[in-house]
């Protein structure tokens, strides 16, 4: 390959990567907005997950898994955002059963949406999404593509 073709290919690859970051960033912003409007509380596994969601812009009540038994859940719409590995799946089922038995309504659709975004970037933990969001913000705002 000649030098011009190599440079063109590299520029195309960089634009493609930048566009993927922009898409991930936009999806995360939209999902954060939906969560803030549609649920009363969010349950996560631990403190790092809580911090990650706060930094992503979640303003609703965030409850860690070990605190959930001490909360009044009656009539609340709750999203359960555990990790996307086998342990997280099992914990998600246990927490969801507990919430429903306590009179709450579990909104599973948000876990599925978060999982979709995370798996596109190879992420299996909620706390790792903070790094992806930061990378996406840098790519979006440094590229001049943000409107």
Locate predicted features:
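Phosphate-handling DNA/RNA-contact segment within nucleic-acid enzymes
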Residues: 1-41, 47-52
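TOPRIM fold recognition
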Residues: 2-13, 47-56, 61, 65-147
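Short glycine-rich phosphate-binding loop at a beta-alpha junction
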Residues: 41-42, 79
